[in-house]
């Protein structure tokens, strides 16, 4: 399956139970924007629906991957679990940045048509994982507070120390190997000058 484990782990920690994949629709599209210029490569876009125990009003949690590879999740399910008392639109307006939320109709993915035709209204609000983290950080729900503390105190520091951001690796992903070598040589020469 192509869905991201991040979404599942967050959800399971918030509801204190296991969730299951109910259904998934996948579509392969040509990847015309790959760094190799190879038109034979494809990107798999998907929409998934996860099911959790009956103790919540929203027992299904929906996710969709857009054509840029960004994962979006339906917002109203999480607003209930996180214990917000206000209406979903008000909560999202107050706590989630505009760039981390959008209507289903605005998500660039061919699989959204299946969702609009069968399940959702075009104005159903979806958020990115960053938006979910913004909601978790603002929730006073005890599970949310505990999860946020775990993210802030353990996951982020450990991840940063294991994988510090390397400027050269970021440039390499943009396929600029010659620039990388030049930058690495300059940095190496600069370090030698400082030591001498």
Swiss-Prot record:
Highest taxon listed in the record's lineage: Viruses
PROSITE patterns for the chain: BRO_N
Domain (Bro-N) ranges: 58-163
Record Pfam families: Bro-N
The protein's name: Uncharacterized Bro-N domain-containing protein R125
Organism: Acanthamoeba polyphaga mimivirus (APMV)
